[in-house]
């Protein structure tokens, strides 16, 4: 299995591979699980192998060589291929070409692509499938055709109206490594209406579809004329480059002959260079003329696209303004103004509702009630700022100014003043430690106590608090 790109997980399991390499039963009805198990293994593996190897067509003999393991080839590949052909996964190359070429293809495609493909089939094999008969894989061919189209649209060659066969092969060299694969891809693109193929003066010319266009247009005389001009410009550029190199060579030879003292040969070289310079000038003028024509063609193509865009814009604008006239617009504006005026009149009418049915006496009565309620609210006592003291001997009552006795107030005020004096006469908080005598209960020393001989500080004693 040297040609196989990757081994499946079961490839190293001899017992499993012995089963998969064995021949199929005569019919699927004999053993359904046996038949389906082999098909689920071989069909995906064949397609994966073809994609990895870049194969657009395969044959029975090729698969038997590629899947050979330990000197043995799978015995059921013919049945697998027949099942793939029944599903449409594989098709005979001859049937594929005939089916694709039966519709829109031009005579040029039949001559340039189909005939070489049919020639590669070889001798007639009859109704039986030969071991070397090519079998194409339509799914992979479509994938390669999409890649070729993408490659063209992203390359500088997209600016050219037509491509030669050599340019197409160079463009698709990595995608289609051999002529047979390229012919299959071109056939698929032709069937999808993505390219046109034409032979002119023994040269095969291919026209690709433009970007953002669904189908390719047929090759026109304008395309052929632009192609000829571009080929002429290319030829003139090559001749100019060759003439410039020849002029440099003659100049160098003239210097060499002059140093060698051969003045006659030096003058001869200069004479040839002068004639060559005239030729270079003529070639340059021709190239400028061709380039000017190509530039005008490009400008005309741009103008054509601009005019086409203008025309599409006018058509869109015309469609947008369909059934819209000046009279209709003025009528609509008048209707809008009329309905706006009507709305203003309605709003003004609704805002001027009469209040004659409202009784003035009822309003005055309601006003007097409001004023009386306000006076009652003003006569209420102030809200107490402190907590309400509730006496346990009698229910809680709100006191008024008439219930308060002046003598009681004076007595309460004297009590407050006496309490303040008592607070003022309290001794200061001792700043040092409290000295406790062991012979008597602890006492706070008063202000009249003598100075302590130990530290010279005064201590004050107060009566010891009594717990009640």
UniProtKB/Swiss-Prot annotation:
Keywords: Coiled coil, Cytoplasm, Nucleus, Protein transport, Transport. Residues 428-468 are annotated as: Disordered. The keyword NAD does not apply. It is found in: Cytoplasm; Nucleus envelope. Residues 233-303, 353-379 form a coiled coil. Belongs to the SNF7 family. ESCRT-III-like protein required to recruit the ESCRT-III complex to the nuclear envelope during late anaphase. Together with SPAST, the ESCRT-III complex promotes nuclear envelope sealing and mitotic spindle disassembly during late anaphase. Plays a role in the endosomal sorting pathway. This is Charged multivesicular body protein 7. The gene is chmp7.
């Amino acid at each position: 299995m040297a040609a196989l790109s990757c081994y499946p997980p079961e490839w190293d399991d001899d017992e499993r591979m012995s089963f998969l390499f064995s021949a199929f039963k005569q019919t699927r009805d004999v053993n359904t699980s046996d038949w389906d198990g082999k098909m689920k293994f071989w069909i995906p593996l064949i397609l994966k192998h073809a994609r990895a190897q870049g194969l657009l067509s395969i044959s029975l003999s090729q698969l038997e060589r590629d899947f050979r393991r330990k000197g043995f080839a799978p015995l059921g590949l013919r049945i697998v291929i027949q099942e793939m052909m029944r599903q449409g996964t594989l098709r005979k190359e001859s049937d594929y070409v005939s089916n694709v070429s039966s519709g829109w293809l031009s005579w040029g495609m039949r001559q340039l692509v189909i005939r070489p493909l049919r020639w590669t089939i070889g001798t007639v094999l009859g109704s039986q499938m030969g071991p070397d008969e090519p079998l194409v894989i339509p799914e992979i061919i479509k994938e390669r055709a999409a890649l070729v189209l993408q490659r063209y649209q992203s390359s500088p060659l997209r600016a050219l109206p037509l491509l030669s066969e050599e340019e197409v092969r160079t463009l698709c060299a990595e995608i289609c490594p051999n002529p047979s694969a390229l012919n299959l891809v071109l056939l698929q693109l032709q069937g999808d209406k993505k390219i046109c193929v034409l032979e002119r003066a023994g040269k095969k010319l291919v026209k690709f579809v433009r970007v953002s266009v669904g189908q390719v247009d047929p090759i026109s005389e304008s395309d052929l004329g632009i192609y000829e001009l571009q080929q002429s410009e290319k030829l003139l550029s090559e001749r100019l480059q060759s003439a410039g190199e020849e002029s440099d060579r003659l100049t160098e030879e003239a210097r060499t002959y002059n140093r060698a003292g051969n003045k006659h040969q030096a003058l001869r070289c200069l004479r040839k260079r002068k004639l060559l310079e005239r030729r270079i000038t003529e070639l340059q003028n021709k190239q400028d003329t061709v380039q000017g024509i190509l530039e005008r063609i490009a400008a005309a193509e741009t103008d054509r696209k601009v005019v086409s865009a203008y025309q599409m814009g006018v058509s869109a604008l015309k469609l947008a303004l369909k059934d819209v006239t000046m009279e209709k617009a003025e009528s609509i504006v008048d209707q809008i103004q009329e309905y706006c005026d009507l709305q203003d009149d309605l709003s003004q009418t609704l805002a001027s509702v009469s209040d004659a049915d409202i009784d003035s006496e009822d309003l005055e009565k309601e006003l007097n009630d409001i004023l009386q309620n306000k006076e009652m609210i003003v006569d209420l006592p102030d809200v107490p700022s402190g907590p309400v003291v509730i006496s346990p001997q009698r229910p809680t009552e709100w006191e008024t100014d008439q219930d308060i006795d002046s003598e009681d107030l004076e007595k309460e005020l004297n009590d407050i003043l006496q309490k303040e004096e008592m607070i003022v006469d309290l001794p200061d908080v001792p700043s040092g430690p409290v000295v406790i005598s062991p012979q008597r209960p602890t006492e706070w020393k008063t202000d009249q106590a003598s100075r302590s001989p130990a530290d010279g500080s005064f201590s004050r004693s107060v009566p010891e608090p009594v717990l009640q």
